[in-house]
């Protein structure tokens, strides 16, 4: 995957086809903490009674992952990277209404194979 506006390649793989890693710059992390809020918790409780997807939480989770990913890419750019490999996501419940979402990977400089 590429983020043209960021000019950074990102992948969950260890390598990027067609590119060679020329320098490893280190681990980069992007974190966001989101609050579900009282309304969201109430809606989730009501939906859990009948079952099914809780769309408000899905949307919040997607936005949080994207924010964490963007922050991780920003850290990589600060190091001079043009790619991030081995990207992973993690999440933790900080308390009953707050979740921490983390994106992390290895910032690298890559060169296109000739």
UniProtKB/Swiss-Prot annotation:
Belongs to the UPF0145 family. This is UPF0145 protein YG5714_0873. It comes from Saccharolobus islandicus (strain Y.G.57.14 / Yellowstone #1) (Sulfolobus islandicus).
